[in-house]
Amino acid sequence: MNFLDSEPDPKQFRALKLFLLAALAVGAVASVAARPVPVPVAPWAVAPLWTLSYGLMAVAGWLAWKRVGLKSFALGFFAAQLALNLVWRLAPLPALGLAMNLCALATLILFARRNFVAAVTFLPSVIWCLFVSLPMNGFWRLY
């Protein structure tokens, strides 16, 4: 059943609010955490990009939850990548960044198998995480 064709379910809206709260809370911490290497983005663009990325991440998690439920393998990876994202921003170690990126890619693949719209919605967040983490992990240097 299409979400737009169905009656609004208060449970779904509460779940969406929780996904948004969790993702945007991690995003808020991530945006103010110390950056050991400058992100190659104009400073004025960082806050809107973080907000958009984590907002899309929340919507993708919610879409996947609607399809597969809370106890799914895909949402386990989603929660793990969100937790790794928070921990990596507080302690940007290369191994944590690699684990975060691998977990985000696994989440993308699992979402694609279960809910294509969730995967497409999650893709910008994966690209943003890769874009931000690669220079911080020293995969390339900015001079």
Language model feature labels by segment:
Residues S6-L21:
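N-terminal membrane topogenic signal
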Residues A22-A30, L84, F131-V132:
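Alpha-helical transmembrane segments of multipass membrane proteins
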Residues F3-D9, P94-L98:
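Short amphipathic, positively biased membrane-proximal segments
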Residues S133-Y143:
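Juxtamembrane boundary at the C-terminal end of a transmembrane helix
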Residues Q81, S125-S133:
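Small-residue-rich segments of transmembrane alpha-helices in multi-pass membrane proteins
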Residues A112-I127:
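Interfacial loop-to-transmembrane junctions
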Residues V32-R114, Y143:
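Portal/gating segments that form or line small-molecule/metal binding sites
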Residues L18-V26, Y54, A58, F77, ...:
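Hydrophobic alpha-helical membrane-embedded or membrane-associated segments
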